[in-house]
Amino acid sequence: MDKSIDFYTKLFELKLVSRREIPQNNAEIAFLRDSEAKGSTLELTFYRNQKKFIQADYEDRVFDHLAFEVKDIEKTIAAMRKEKVTITDEPFKLSATGPMIAFVEDPDGTLIELIQRT
């Protein structure tokens, strides 16, 4: 949990607004909010006994990735390289008139899409 909080607060400038234990679920949650207070909140959940909480109706669900809009994708990628973040796809133009995008992984291997609008 600490690595994930550090990743999102340092590289995406999210602010930790709450962190607490959920004893009945043997879990911990943290809420991170956009530093510009645009209303976006990211909830991180760490289950200490993950297998206990996998339910049949969730097995068919597939989570692909998160996406964050960044002002300068090259600057963001450079900062991530300094922090030894895994860069999955270097910045590239999605189409002739589309945004620049790149993909990285968070400390838990979650795929993160970076988008720089043109």
Residue ranges: model-predicted function:
Residues L32-A37, V104-P107, R117:
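Active-site beta-strand termini and strand-to-loop segments that position acidic
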Residues M1-G39, K82:
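Core segments of cupin and vicinal oxygen chelate
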Residues M1-D2, N49-K51, Y58-L111:
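Vicinal oxygen chelate
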Residues F46-N49, R117:
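Acetyl-CoA-dependent GNAT
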